[in-house]
Amino acid sequence: MAYYSRPASAGAARAQDDQDPYPYYPDPDLIVGSGANTSFVNPYEASGAASSASHTSPFSDAHAASASPASILPLSHQQVSAHAPQQQHMSISVDPRDGQQSRMPGLSESFYSQAAYALASPPPAAGALSPSAHLATLPEHSQAPLSGSVDGEYTYYSQSAAGHYSSLAHRHGQDDEDDDDAETKYSPSSAHDEKYAYDRPDSAAAGTSPFGRAAGIAYLQSPYAQVARNDDDDEDEDAEDPYRVLTRDSAFGGDNGQGYDPNSAYGGAGMAGPTGQFGDNHFDTQHFGPAPARGAQLRRHKTKKNVRLTKGNLILDCPVPTKLQTFLTRRAEDEFTTMRYSAVTCDPDDFASESFTLRPALYGRHTELFIAITMYNEDEVLFCRTFHGVMKNIAHLCSRNKSRTWGKDGWKKVVVAIISDGRKKIHPRVLDCLAALGVYQDGVAKNMVDGKEVRAHLYEYTTQLSIDSNLQFKGAERGLVPMQIIFCLKEKNAKKINSHRWFFNAFCPILQPNVTILLDVGTRPENKSIYYLWKSFDLNSNVAGACGEICAETKGKWGVGPLLLNPLVAAQNFEYKISNILDKTTESVMGYISVLPGAFSAYRYIALQNDEFGHGPLASYFKGENLLGADADVFTSNMYLAEDRILCFELAAKRGHGWVLKYVKSARGVTDVPEGLPEFISQRRRWLNGSFFAAVYALYHTAQFVRSGHNVWRKSLLVFESFYSFVNMCFAWFGLANYYIFFRILTTSLEDPTFKLRGIGVFNVFMQYIYLGTVVSSFIFAMGNRPQGSKWKYWAAVVVFALLTVYMMVAAVLCLSKVVARVEHDAIYAQMVVSLLATYGVYLISSLLACDPLHLITSFLQYLLLAPTYINILNIYAFCNLHDFSWGTKGDTSISADLGAVVSTSKGTVEITLPTAQADIDTAYDDALNNLRTRPMIIRGDASNAEKEARQMDYYKNIRTNVVLAWALSNGVLAAFILNGDAAGTFSDTGGVTRTKVYMVLVLIFVAGMACIRFIGSTLYLTIRLING
């Protein structure tokens, strides 16, 4: 037993000003004795005598301390030691032979959950005493002994009178291999006095260092530092809390010291100075010198082990990093301390039959909600935005204590599957995020198992931490709860629809969830959105699918932010708002929503099931996954660019059932929209082609609604909706001609003598040639250039069309002023005015009824200016690229060997190479945190182009040419027929009925009629929502 003493008044002084007036810095010279009997010198005794007792020590007799202990103390110690009051002795019991971890009686669980540990310096050379032998004080009111040992580290816990916890560790008997790379004393896993308080639990508070500190020292709880709050992130519940971020000056290999505040007197290289405050340069360098670069510390020692397969499958339970465990508030269950890896060697459809299973099923838990997050190569910011949004939603479910379904342990009923499309496509820093959360570990996965190719790598872990889009860690102190995660890293890139097949056909049959939710990385569900989606299924047993409101990310509150300064973002914001307010609500009332956005939608799992013959929604949904060449018609291939539309139709028209689809206004998901023109054009190419051919598919199979299990009233609404969709599709087909006809009529009408505009005829001819030339240029660009390679050409076309729109709007105002003046004398003019008022009045009134009118102010003008871009450029590019429907790399049949293989042995086991040392696992964890902090440049290999079969390309290009020819000719014929009349006399005072005048009236009435139908549907939706609460 080793005894040492301290002044009884020290604790009182510390409690008064939260600073220890008796800072104590241990030194090896305080250790005296010989052999197994080693004593610690009391630094407060001026005589240097030691209080001693027996203490088992690995140290030799070579160094009996003879130096005066006062010589190594800082000046403050030398000044106060003479004034030290009576001594009070505490005891610590340490038994290095004890291999079991023991706890001090009488201390609460919070003591151990809050105590941190620090790695000591390397062991001394032979015949030398260790410079890292530390002492720690126990509370004056406690005499209970404390002993502990974890893998050779003996931890001395201390608690000040003010209730501040700390700990020190002393290594004994470590391998030289591990000691060479040991972390410095103030490692990121230790807890010291913090410059900023970070809302610890009430059981412990931030306080002083275990030894006290000299003036000027500022410790950080590495790797965190306080930063200015970013109000762009929707973290309402954290508004009162300071933010924590990964600091660049942490113990992870930074240049400015080992976890110290670089602005303090002891930050940076000053800690390793030749003659520091602590005197001895060897002492300073041992404890506070700069750590070697992280890259030089990588050991990656792997050991070959024989592992018995589980029913023929490779399944490993891997311990999580030590540092991660110190952050956790729950450590009792295996799901928090081990990560489960499964090497899946079968097709998704055979997952259950090949004896694979999932952790929640092993625990016997019922899965109420199963959430799929699909991603491809998105970066860590988009991933964390989605991930943290889901975690906050799960926390809300657990806060509903009065719910029969949810409550305190509601997180056990929610499982989140993160499915990444291609191991070599995933963003490296997303893997760092998952590693920081404990979900992913490098070096575990394998390419082959007993001669079978691995199709997907499954990592299962229940995390208690989250990382938001600012890369700030959040945990239980922010009200978050654990989340069960299944990370499916597909070996090959096989498109998003294949990711959904893993979700629906592999994982769902194991967990049998009630409701499934589909999310894309980059979409952030707002705090209660997932609950509102789930509630729509709970209230109505006939609901098979539901979606929320998809909002464009504007980086501001109430949908108003700096991104609206980008006209592309503003136009998309207006488009999203009108679609949600008018289209989704109308379709919801009828019972069939043409598309539940894959970015944020929900489905009842039982409604998705196929019948006994294998026919049903999921069978139709996955039909187009492996279509190749001319064996697949162009309609089917393009249709599966909008695969979510197929799933919606198959649900609503399912034979013998009466499933309906609902829009849930309260469930909001915020998503990034393209900010650049090339990305915008490429995205809309997929959307337009997919939606067009999916609409053709739905119209062709309208009879399935009649054979469904809906009642007569619902069937009538569904048939009417099909007719409504057909009329809209026809109108959109002739959109290219309609816009040009209106431009030609409005501008040519200014040539009427009553306007008294000289030279306007010549100007109009010039503008009309500019218009037609831009349209022809758009065809040429679309046929021969990718938007990414012709960015400025496309921007020039967008600007020209916007200027032409301005001219057309000026002409429209002048013509409208004349129309208003002649309303009483000409019925046709009156119909024009009424149609225009009805169209724009619907936008205004419906937005006001929905309590969401801001988009009319912030985004309407931008949408008008970009309207010709939507009608001309986007449609031209989409139709001219019907042959391009691929999402990824088809035909990728190569087998990678970079992860290694699992080889069978003669003893019925397999030989596998794994990182076994805990230090290697911990080092990999530190690397992940370091990568998130520094964000190193990602170097990707050259993208390989997928090989296309000649007949496949010929077939699709031939279809493309036929469709474009039919579309262009039909629009040209319509324009020529209408404009063959007297366009200049459309608004003439002479009156009379002309072809152009009749055409304008019919188009305006049609647009107004469609708007009124949507307005009626929107109003009915709001009424039903109000009645149902």
Swiss-Prot record:
It is a multi-pass membrane protein. It catalyses: [(1->4)-N-acetyl-beta-D-glucosaminyl](n) + UDP-N-acetyl-alpha-D-glucosamine = [(1->4)-N-acetyl-beta-D-glucosaminyl](n+1) + UDP + H(+). Glycans are attached at N37, N401, N514, N527, N689. Residues 1-29, 46-105, 168-209 are annotated as: Disordered. The keyword Glycoprotein applies. Its EC number is 2.4.1.16. Polymerizes chitin, a structural polymer of the cell wall and septum, by transferring the sugar moiety of UDP-GlcNAc to the non-reducing end of the growing chitin polymer. This is Chitin synthase 3. It comes from Mycosarcoma maydis.
